[in-house]
C-alpha cells in the first residue's frame, strides 16, 4: 500500500547530541530513539516520514527547498536556529508547505533570548515543553490536518 502523505522531519543544531546534552532539559532519549518511535507511529498512520538532522543552516534550507512539490507537511525542531534564522523562515515561506514547530523544552521558561521565534507566527502550530512526546503529538496533528484537507 502506498503511503497517503509525505512528511519531512527536520532537526536542527545540536539535536544529534540528545541523550547526553543537558538531559535535565532535553531528556535522556537519543535522536535515533525518538526517530524510531516516530517511524513506528508514522507506519501505523500510513504516512511516509523522512528524517533529516543537520547542524548547518544551509543544509536545512536545501532540504526545505527539495521538499517543494513532493512533501505534504513539515515538522521542524529548529533548535537554536529558532531565535536567529530569518533564512529558515524565508525558506519555509517560499515553499508554502504547512509546518509545525517543535521544541523539547519550554522555551518560554528559559533564557529571555529563547523567547522569540522567527518561525512561530508562520507555523500551523507550535509544540514546546512536552519532551520527546511533542514529536508524536506534532505528527498526529499533521496527519489530522492533512486528512481534513
Swiss-Prot record:
PROSITE patterns: DEHYDROQUINASE_II (PS01029). It comes from the Bacteria. Its EC number is 4.2.1.10. Signal peptide: none annotated. Substrate binds at residues 77, 83, 90, 104-105, 114. Keywords: Amino-acid biosynthesis, Aromatic amino acid biosynthesis, Lyase. Pathway: Metabolic intermediate biosynthesis; chorismate biosynthesis; chorismate from D-erythrose 4-phosphate and phosphoenolpyruvate: step 3/7. The keyword Amino-acid biosynthesis applies. One of its GO terms (molecular function) is 3-dehydroquinate dehydratase activity. The active site is at residues 26, 103. It catalyses: 3-dehydroquinate = 3-dehydroshikimate + H2O. One of its GO terms (biological process) is chorismate biosynthetic process. The record marks 21 as: Transition state stabilizer. The keyword Lyase applies. Homododecamer. Belongs to the type-II 3-dehydroquinase family. PANTHER family: CATABOLIC 3-DEHYDROQUINASE (PTHR21272:SF3). Catalyzes a trans-dehydration via an enolate intermediate. This is 3-dehydroquinate dehydratase. It comes from Edwardsiella ictaluri (strain 93-146).
Amino acid at each position: 500500500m502506498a503511503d497517503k502523505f509525505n512528511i519531512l522531519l527536520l532537526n536542527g543544531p545540536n539535536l544529534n547530541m540528545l541523550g547526553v546534552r543537558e538531559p535535565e532539559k532535553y531528556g535522556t532519549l537519543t535522536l535515533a530513539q525518538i526517530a524510531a518511535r516516530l517511524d513506528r507511529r508514522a507506519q501505523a498512520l500510513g504516512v511516509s516520514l523522512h528524517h533529516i538532522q543537520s547542524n548547518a543552516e544551509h543544509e536545512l534550507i536545501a532540504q526545505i527547498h527539495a521538499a517543494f512539490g513532493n512533501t505534504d507537511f513539515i515538522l521542524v525542531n529548529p533548535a537554536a536556529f529558532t531565535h536567529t534564522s530569518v533564512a529558515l523562515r524565508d525558506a519555509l515561506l517560499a515553499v508554502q508547505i504547512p509546518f509545525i514547530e517543535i521544541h523539547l523544552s519550554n522555551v518560554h521558561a528559559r533564557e529571555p533570548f529563547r523567547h522569540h521565534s522567527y518561525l512561530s507566527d508562520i507555523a500551523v502550530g507550535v509544540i514546546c515543553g512536552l519532551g520527546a512526546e511533542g514529536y508524536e503529538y506534532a505528527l498526529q496533528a499533521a496527519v489530522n490536518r492533512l486528512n481534513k484537507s
